[in-house]
Amino acid sequence: MKTFVLGGGCFWCLDAVYQKTRGVSSVVSGYTGGHVRNPDYYEVCSGTTGHAEVVAVTFDETVVPEEVILDMFFALHDPTTLNRQGYDVGTQYRSSMFYTTTEEKVLFEEAIERAQALWSDPIVTEVSRLPEFHEAEEVHQNYYAKFPYQGYCQVIINPKLAKARKYYSAWLTA
């Protein structure tokens, strides 16, 4: 089993897709990359903690290759916009990848190279060593499954799920 910690805008979006990905055993929404210990959602949203909203995706690489997890990540958000995803603006929404080993760092850099071929603008994804990971509050875990009819889910997450189904259907469970 491997765990990648990835930030691509609001963590609810990545969580929704990875929850439906074959071989993924756990998706935990959280915060990392900042300077405040044990931040909460409101502190992170204030933009003063330096943290990014991220998901820790644990998966069986014999079922779903690392490259698929990473390529999905780059397909599901815009890695060329600095500190924003659509209407979500702030450093907490930055495109980011947090590694724990040199091997992961290399995998992340290779994924950026693959993704750059798909984008005309330069990719600005931050690649950093994982500092402390802070699990987000329970309401943010598996958010889409809890609140599928909430406005954000309908307008923002549903199109990302549709895109994942279009390009990664072989890797999705439903």
From Swiss-Prot:
Q: Which Enzyme Commission number(s) are listed?
A: 1.8.4.11
The residues forming a coiled coil are none
Q: Name one GO biological process term.
A: protein modification process
Q: Which InterPro entries match?
A: Met_Sox_Rdtase_MsrA_dom, Met_Sox_Rdtase_MsrA_sf
Tell me a Gene Ontology molecular-function term this record carries.
peptide-methionine (S)-S-oxide reductase activity
**Active-site residues per Swiss-Prot or TrEMBL entry:** 10
What Gene3D superfamilies does the record point to? Peptide methionine sulphoxide reductase MsrA
At the top level, the lineage of the source is Bacteria
Recorded hits in PANTHER family, A to Z, give:
PEPTIDE METHIONINE SULFOXIDE REDUCTASE, PEPTIDE METHIONINE SULFOXIDE REDUCTASE MSRA 2
Q: Which family does it belong to?
A: Belongs to the MsrA Met sulfoxide reductase family.
Protein name in the entry:
Peptide methionine sulfoxide reductase MsrA
- Source species of the chain: Paenarthrobacter aurescens (strain TC1)
Q: What is the lineage of its organism?
A: Bacteria, Bacillati, Actinomycetota, Actinomycetes, Micrococcales
